[in-house]
């Protein structure tokens, strides 16, 4: 278990990483525009996708799990994330508010993805953990099954973040390391 002082320091570091991610949007947008147009997307289409929208902070006290009606209290880092911004869309990444988690988790498409992961991807988060130990953190593409999940291993500990994109899985010890990865400074 991580000590209180260490967690407070990590939550402050997370705020720095979130700020960096927010303020480096212009660089990511320009890189995205070049890449998207190189694959045949028109500049107008690419610009329509290359947006950042950050909603106001809303009170969040718990995170719903995939188990209907069950939630987990926010860890210190999740509390820092929700104290920093509300709904957050950045090009393809969409960091969700709890009500959005509930909406997406109830869709047939998402439930089918969870079922497929449990049946066909050995050692994936849905394969290894029950719905009461999984939450949805962000979505890059619902259609393609690009999701970042929170994995609640032990009560009182920071949840891990497991990201799925195409046929790849990326695991992070906690939210701070996930944001470092988003910023291109991964330690894992």
Question: Language model features by range: what are they?
Answer:
Residues 1-144:
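A surface-exposed partner-binding patch
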Residues 134, 155-158:
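A short, compositionally biased
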Residues 46, 159-161:
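Short linear proline/tyrosine/threonine-rich motifs used for host-factor recruitment
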Residues 1, 187-188:
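Short intrinsically disordered terminal tails
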Residues 86, 111, 119, 150, ...:
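Short, low-complexity intrinsically disordered segments
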């Amino acid at each position: 278990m991580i000590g209180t002082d260490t967690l407070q320091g990590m939550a402050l570091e997370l705020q720095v990483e979130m700020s960096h991610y927010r303020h480096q949007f212009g660089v990511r947008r320009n890189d995205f525009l070049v890449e998207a147009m190189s694959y045949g997307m028109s500049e107008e289409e690419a610009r329509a996708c290359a947006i950042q929208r950050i909603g106001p902070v809303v009170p969040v006290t718990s995170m719903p799990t995939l188990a209907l009606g069950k939630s987990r209290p926010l860890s210190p880092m999740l509390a820092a994330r929700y104290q920093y911004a509300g709904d957050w869309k950045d090009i393809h990444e969409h960091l969700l508010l709890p009500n959005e988690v509930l909406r997406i988790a109830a869709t047939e498409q998402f439930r089918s993805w969870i079922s497929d992961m449990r049946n066909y991807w050995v050692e994936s988060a849905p394969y290894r953990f029950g719905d009461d130990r999984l939450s949805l953190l962000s979505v890059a593409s619902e259609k393609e099954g690009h999701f970042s999940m929170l994995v609640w291993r032990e009560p009182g500990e920071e949840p891990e973040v497991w990201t799925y994109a195409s046929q790849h899985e990326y695991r992070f010890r906690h939210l701070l390391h996930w944001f470092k990865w988003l910023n291109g400074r991964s330690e894992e």
